[in-house]
Swiss-Prot record:
Alphabetized Pfam families for the sequence: DUF1517 (PF07466)
Name of the gene this protein is made from: flpA
UniProt-recorded name of the protein: Protein FLAP1 homolog A
UniProt keyword list: Cell inner membrane, Cell membrane, Membrane, Thylakoid, Transmembrane, Transmembrane helix
Reported function: Essential for photosynthetic growth under fluctuating light by modulating PxcA- and PxcL-dependent intracellular pH regulation via proton transport (e.g. transient pH reduction upon transition from dark to light followed by an increase in the light until light-to-dark shift).
């Protein structure tokens, strides 16, 4: 066939080589066009939607008021008995017989002793005042613990995802008690499904209250940036929904079979007054302990909470490659 083609007459100034080059160019253009047309579809299939529940406030706790009650009984204000007020010591000196039977030397010694007591009292008062000032400074900028737990579960844990979706729709994230309930329910949802656990990690740190909000937001933004879109969000009682989901917990027309997405990743970030010491996660028992510790934070200590999960919508995927590239700190449990 090639010999026959080569024997075919060609117009002048046209060679078989030029024909071959032009044909190759056409094929390349066709391949590029095909790639441009179908690449968005592939990207849509790799879309990672995310859900978010949370809120909080990093206000300093109110410090107890410091009050000073004056001496009772009128010891220093009873008429003109003490001549000009002050500490009122003149009445002590006659008692010891100043200028009388005990002689002047003993009275001088008593005066020196009293002066020493007064000086020490003034010094101690100044020292305690300074210490009180330091205590006030510490109480106005107390220590805050910030902790994060991440759990990678099999994609077949649809009941867990449904619980998180429903929690996002019903949670009161604008109050301390409501946020405490979110933390408890999210940790309970994970603790109830250990059969789906595959990966886990935990980290905790402590900072002063003045730096806590920035540290907390940095952690939250790092995790939220891994989503292509937040399709369900309830933050500080601001509820937002979007995307393809037709019903919370229901199947959408684009739903994929169980296991096709491979994983669900849940992140819980909390900030609380005091220490938050979580054990390093190397197995399922340590992951369980970390979840129980985090879920046990009382509402009066909890400052802020973020519960994040991906994928949120049916049809979106989180593959093993995504886990390796986006969540390298995770460990098999």
């Amino acid at each position: 066939m090639l010999k026959m083609l080569k024997n075919l007459p060609l117009p002048k100034n046209i060679t078989w080589r030029s024909v071959w080059m032009r044909g190759t160019s056409v094929v390349i253009i066709f391949v590029l066009a095909f790639t441009l047309v179908f690449t968005p579809t592939f990207e849509a299939e790799a879309r990672r939607s995310g859900g978010r529940i949370g809120g909080g406030s990093f206000r300093a706790p109110s410090a107890p008021s410091r009050s000073y009650s004056g001496p009772s009984g009128g010891s220093y204000r009873s008429g003109g008995t003490y001549g000009g007020g002050g500490f009122g010591f003149p009445f002590i000196i006659p008692f010891f017989g100043f200028g009388g039977g005990f002689g002047g030397i003993f009275g001088i010694l008593v005066m020196i002793a009293i002066a020493n007591v007064v000086i020490n009292a003034i010094r101690n008062g100044g020292g305690s005042s300074g210490e009180g000032g330091g205590g006030l400074a510490a109480s106005s900028d107390p220590q805050v613990g910030i902790a994060q737990i991440q759990v990678g579960l099999l994609a077949s844990a649809k009941e867990l995802k449904k619980e998180l979706d429903e929690l996002a729709l019903s949670a009161d994230t604008g109050t301390a008690n409501g946020r405490s309930l979110v933390l408890q329910e999210a940790t309970l949802a994970l603790l109830r499904h250990p059969e789906y656990w595959v990966y886990g990690s935990s980290q905790s740190d402590k900072v002063r209250l003045s730096a806590a909000e920035a540290a907390f937001n940095q952690l939250a933004l790092t995790e939220r940036s891994k989503f292509t879109d937040e399709t369900l969000s309830n933050f500080n009682n601001q509820l937002r929904q979007g995307g393809r989901a037709t019903a919370i917990g229901g199947d959408s027309p684009d739903a994929v079979p169980d296991g096709a997405g491979e994983y669900i990743l849940v992140t819980i970030i909390a900030a609380a007054l005091g220490n938050l010491n979580l054990p390093a996660v190397n197995d399922s028992s340590q992951l369980k302990q970390s979840l129980q510790t985090l879920g046990g934070i009382s509402s009066d200590r909890l400052l802020a909470i973020e519960v994040l999960w991906t994928p949120q919508e049916e049809g979106d995927t989180l593959t093993s490659n995504d886990i390796i590239s986006e969540y390298p700190e995770l460990r098999l449990v």
